[in-house]
Amino acid sequence: EGSPIKSVKDLVAAIKADPSKVVFGAGGSVGSQDWMKAALTARASGLDPKAMRFVAFEGGGEAITALQGGHVQVYSGDASEAEEQIKAGAKIRVLAVMADKRLEGSLSGIPTMKELGYDVQWPIIRGFYMGPKVSDADFKAWSDTFTKMMATPAYDKLRAERGLFKFALTGKELDAFIKERMATYRKLAADFNLRVAQ
């Protein structure tokens, strides 16, 4: 609430002025999805992510508590998680989202990083995954069930209420998308000198 960082422009200026005074915090360790968001923001600011200060917490709730207490200056977690904390009374400010377009719901007024002039996108994809030994028939049955569910008005309403962007891939299309994202992640991990299991 009392943070001098009120916009992405302020955040970038603070990082450039003295990166040691800008501590990122999130649920997840170095190399995690939330760390990657912080690293991409640091890189967009001209800072080598290896020089970035990052505190890993057990989860987003702990990180948001640390943010409110001034122990970290930036929370690089899920927008939907921040939204729930704001609804519960947390005094935090969402600066931008890393999706390709604005979210719906209560976060619809929050700009994307791209809108603000930073080519940074890192949407978190949530899904249900099955093991490799599941039969084709069972895989298709589950895929069809999720496809039908995601086409309902009730699902669309719930998704919008949770600040989640529209994303309705299932089956082979989702599998291909995840493999493409993993290739991007592996390249970024190599750029950031992280080791990734093959």
Model-derived segments and their meaning:
Residues 1-62, 66, 113, 125-158:
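Hinge/capping helix and adjacent helix->loop/strand transition within the periplasmic-binding protein
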Residues 7, 70-71, 89, 117, ...:
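Conserved functional loop/turn residues at catalytic and ligand-binding sites
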Residues 15, 40, 61-75, 80-90, ...:
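Short helices/loops that flank or line small-molecule/ion binding pockets
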Residues 24, 73-77, 93-96, 185-186:
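Paired acidic/hydrophobic, glycine-rich loop segments that form the ligand-binding mouth/hinge
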Residues 57, 76-78, 97, 169:
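Short beta-strand and adjacent tight-turn residues that come in two discontinuous sequence segments
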Residues 81-151, 183:
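C-terminal lobe and pocket-closing loops
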Residues 136-198:
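An extracytoplasmic/periplasmic, membrane-proximal ligand-sensing/linker region
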